[in-house]
């Protein structure tokens, strides 16, 4: 079955509302499947995006005052409802917690097909230290070779319908060809890139949405959507940071 990443559910729980299934696309459940515990000092760009104090998505630091996440993580919610936690391997304690000051969603974001799935967050100036630092953006027009591993991190659930882990998780998954991803889903746009194993078993999947996909020292993708969780034949789909429209939008909001 298509997964809904539990973003709507997590947000609803934090405000006591019943979530509506608005999306035609299967949003990634945002969990790390087949991964292991990670130390924030090894992934200092990782943020927990919190909605009324509860973890709802991942995000990535790209400067002292900017972070990026998925548009579907912030769509429909007020800026004042969001904070981020930086510099902690634990999603509920430690590090720096700051109020999000501004949310800039890509103007062409399409919730129904999950295209242009990127938001830039403006933050108070973060103090870079051990466990808090920026990740470089993949250059516009750059291409990652098929088979190159992407490093996915976050606090998403470890099993379908399970509770969120307290400790940061990480997994590596290889890039697959656009043709393979197109054959799996039938409708992949140039703003999307796909990673996964043909046999399944490892994946991003409830709470990791908006989080980083890092390869060769660059932020190459943003956790976006997919079918199932680590399901054979269905790679995870990520917003492609090197796409010209995505890359220009992010840089125009720095």
Feature names for model-found ranges:
Residues 2-13, 17-18, 61-72, 82-83, ...:
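C-terminal subregion of chymotrypsin/trypsin-like serine protease catalytic domains
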Residues 38-42, 61, 76-78, 92, ...:
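Extracellular/periplasmic catalytic domains that process cell-envelope and extracellular macromolecules
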Residues 49-53, 62-64, 70-73, 86-88, ...:
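Active-site-proximal beta-strand/loop segments in catalytic clefts of secreted hydrolases
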Residues 29-30, 49, 67-70, 75-111, ...:
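Conserved H-D interstitial segment of serine endopeptidase catalytic domains
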Residues 1-68, 81-88, 193:
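Protease-domain processing segments flanking chymotrypsin-fold serine proteases, especially trypsin-like
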Residues 19-21, 98, 103, 118-124, ...:
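Chymotrypsin/trypsin-fold serine protease catalytic domain
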Residues 37-39, 50-52, 109-113, 163, ...:
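Short Gly/Pro-enriched turn/cap motifs at secondary-structure boundaries
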Residues 72-77, 87-92, 124-129, 156-160, ...:
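Acidic glycine-/aspartate-rich tracts in secreted/extracellular proteins
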